[in-house]
Regions:
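N-terminal beta1-alpha1 ligand-phosphate binding loop
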Residues: 1-18, 23-28
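Flexible, gly/pro- and Lys/Arg-enriched active-site loops
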Residues: 24, 31-39, 54-144
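Active-site-adjacent structural patch at catalytic or cofactor/ligand-binding sites
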Residues: 42
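Helix N-cap motif at beta-to-alpha junctions
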Residues: 49-52
Length: 144
């Protein structure tokens, strides 16, 4: 939906704010949820921040809104989808932002880019089970 590279760039800029950051490569994966739509472009952003999970969720929603995201169809097409996966060693049981993300270990589009930035968090066996589902596209700069 729209310029995926531009949406990812906008999302990164808004979510990271002024915090130092690292970013994974961008990967293309099949859509999740069973609704017919284009393949997804995915990345993982790591930021050094004192923001709480709720603060990060607010940044995520701001980024999605800036890219014109609407929530008309559950798991339907969207311009940008930002999930808060981990916040240091913090946990959150707030139903709006569960941390660690409860399904991240089931998602190739999370684990492959996460492994680039934090290899100690992802086991090799788990990675191997997902590799054929993910196509590396390159860095975000290459896709703009």
């Amino acid at each position: 939906m729209g310029d995926r590279g531009s949406h990812l760039s906008t999302g990164v800029e808004i979510v990271r704010g002024n915090d130092p950051f690292r970013i994974s490569q961008v990967y293309e994966t099949d859509p999740v949820g069973g609704v017919a739509q284009d393949d997804f472009w995915n990345l993982v952003l790591e930021i050094q921040t004192d923001a709480s999970p709720l603060d990060l969720l607010a940044r995520a929603r701001e980024a999605e809104a800036a890219c014109g995201r609407t929530r008309e169809v559950h798991w339907g097409p969207r311009t940008l989808d930002v999930d808060v996966l981990l916040v240091g060693d913090e946990t959150s049981e707030n139903p709006d932002v569960l941390v660690p993300h409860p399904r991240m270990h089931e998602r190739a589009f999370v684990l492959i880019p996460l492994q680039e930035l934090a290899p100690h968090l992802v086991t090799q066996d788990l990675l191997n089970s997902f590799r054929e589902r993910v196509v590396p596209l390159g860095t975000l700069d290459m896709l703009r």
